[in-house]
Amino acid sequence: FHNFTLLHDDIMDNAAVRRGKPSVYARWGGNVAILSGDAMLISAYRLLAQAPPALLPRILEVFNTMALGVCEGQQYDMDFESKQKVSVVEYMSMIELKTSVLVAGSAMMGAILGGADEEQSRRLYQFAIELGMAFQLQDDLLDSYGGEELGKTIGGDILEGKKSYLMVTAMSRADEEQREVLRHTYKDAALAPAEKIARVRAVFDALDVPRLTEQQISLRFDRALATLDGLNVPDARKEPLREYARSLMGRRK
């Protein structure tokens, strides 16, 4: 399911690179990317159908809610591209749907299949919500300040005019002169890519946006681990999830 979302996301974003290699969309075109994504979604349902019959209705309920949430979040993300003003609250709501719900729904399905009760399942869901938020905020930060070894085009969000967490935070803190620099730079199609990235990052730096983003990442990650710690199961059973969280957040510049 995740790869299905990425294939379709690359079409909507006109993304040339995915995981350090040409995207399916860039290499084989939109039609192949659409059909490949559709096939992956169907394959996901085929795998879900193997769940124990007694649990299948609940599993499908969680999966379908998750899938609809991801689609809703993607629509918000696209809407933000043409929206003049996006608040930090609106942005956080969008990434919860687009990213966190995917991680959280997966965690909840695993909990249900593993025999967890409702309280345990809900706690694992919340753990994954916070972890997904931390991951997406870090992804935004690394897009502008990370290294190309991560498989992303550096400054891709800036060049595409996307309203990342860094951008909406900067706009919320900037004075009118700084806002105008950001607006003009984002819209200036004639500006060389390197210069566009440098100008936007200069405003981000002046407003302390990278540090503030790091703070928010740490806050969400700490909340995730605290939620996991509160789960009433032996610690040894929680350690694989801690390892997963650390590996997910292990990407750094």
Question: What is each model feature region?
Answer:
Residues 1-253:
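All-alpha prenyltransferase/terpene-synthase fold signal
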